[in-house]
Amino acid sequence: MAEITKADVISFIEKMSVLELAEMVKELEEKFGVSAAAPVAVAAVAGPAAAEAAEEKTEFDVILKAAGANKIGVIKVVRALTSLGLKEAKDLVDGAPQPLKTGVSKEEAEEAKKQLVEAGAEVEIK
């Protein structure tokens, strides 16, 4: 069996359409649990402006860090919170750390965290 070189891969990718490339990137992100988004450097804001920016945060992300010992219980809570199917919820829990809910209110994020922690999960709110 011939070995595939980087040049072969690049040649193959060059022939793909933009839509095919976008789908491939999405599949690679899901397969390897990474994001293709470039990191964004943000300049530090000094003084009161920084405090105001921190206080104004209205959208939060609930990140499932780890399932803990009660994986089945965590999967049940994930299904209830996200309305995912059993396989999708299990894949999400198995792939931790993963974002569970994004852009939700502080109250909703805290409630989701409470339910997940009660089920034995390790959760972070960003």
UniProtKB/Swiss-Prot annotation:
Any GO CC annotation of this UniProt entry: cytosolic large ribosomal subunit
Keywords: Ribonucleoprotein, Ribosomal protein
Protein's UniProt keywords contain Ribonucleoprotein: yes
GO molecular function: mRNA binding; structural constituent of ribosome
Single Gene Ontology BP annotation: translation
Subunit organization: Homodimer. Part of the ribosomal stalk of the 50S ribosomal subunit. Forms a multimeric L10(L12)X complex, where L10 forms an elongated spine to which 2 to 4 L12 dimers bind in a sequential fashion. Binds GTP-bound translation factors.
Family membership noted in the UniProt record: Belongs to the bacterial ribosomal protein bL12 family.
Function: Forms part of the ribosomal stalk which helps the ribosome interact with GTP-bound translation factors. Is thus essential for accurate translation.
Name the record gives this protein: Large ribosomal subunit protein bL12
Organism of origin: Geotalea daltonii (strain DSM 22248 / JCM 15807 / FRC-32) (Geobacter daltonii)
